[in-house]
Regions:
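N-terminal hydrophobic targeting/anchoring segments and the immediately downstream early-domain regions
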Residues: 1-148
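Loop-centered beta-sheet repeat module
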Residues: 138-164
């Protein structure tokens, strides 16, 4: 097939972790066997923050969920590729799924700019503010904008181009 699909949001990483399901094949919305029918498949995988948890608990949960998802990508590296940029995306072979990482409900940052650096360094490219954190509104912060806003480019100097 020559079909191409870009899906800008899924909570599959959260559910995979909570329900102990693999990325290769599962009964969730996203699985590599389901994506295999597309010549090009791009997925933004959002790590969801459970709003019943405190900001600190959500922050700890985030790292467990993210690490689990990255391990699944690594275990399936022939058919799943983690991307941080358009350049990364152009290197993904036909038939492989390209994943970009995001966080949904960035309240787990909890006003701590250093956490924005940590998210950026952990390969996240977007953070959504929703629910309580945004007063019911949705806002998206891209990694480049977040890096510029928090001084990431100045702090790391040489990575200025990467941040933009």
């Amino acid at each position: 097939m020559d079909y191409k699909l870009i899906d800008l949001h899924c909570d599959t990483a959260y559910r995979m972790y909570k329900e102990k399901k693999p990325l290769r094949s599962n009964d969730l919305h996203i699985a590599l066997d389901k994506a295999s029918g597309f010549k090009k498949y791009v997925q933004v995988a959002a790590v969801w923050s459970d709003n019943t948890r405190s900001d600190e608990e959500a922050y700890s949960d985030f790292w467990r969920i993210l690490n689990n998802f990255k391990m699944e990508i690594e275990a399936n590296r022939q058919s799943a590729v983690l991307c941080r940029s358009f350049d990364d995306l152009t290197q993904v072979p036909d038939g492989a799924a390209a994943f970009f990482l995001a966080v949904e409900d960035a309240r787990l940052v909890s006003g701590n700019v250093e956490r924005m650096h940590e998210l950026y360094d952990a390969d996240l490219v977007a953070a959504g503010l929703c629910g309580v954190a945004a007063g019911g509104r949705i806002a998206v912060v891209t990694a480049g904008a977040a890096a510029a806003a928090c001084g990431h480019a100045q702090r790391h100097g040489a990575c200025h181009q990467r941040c933009e």
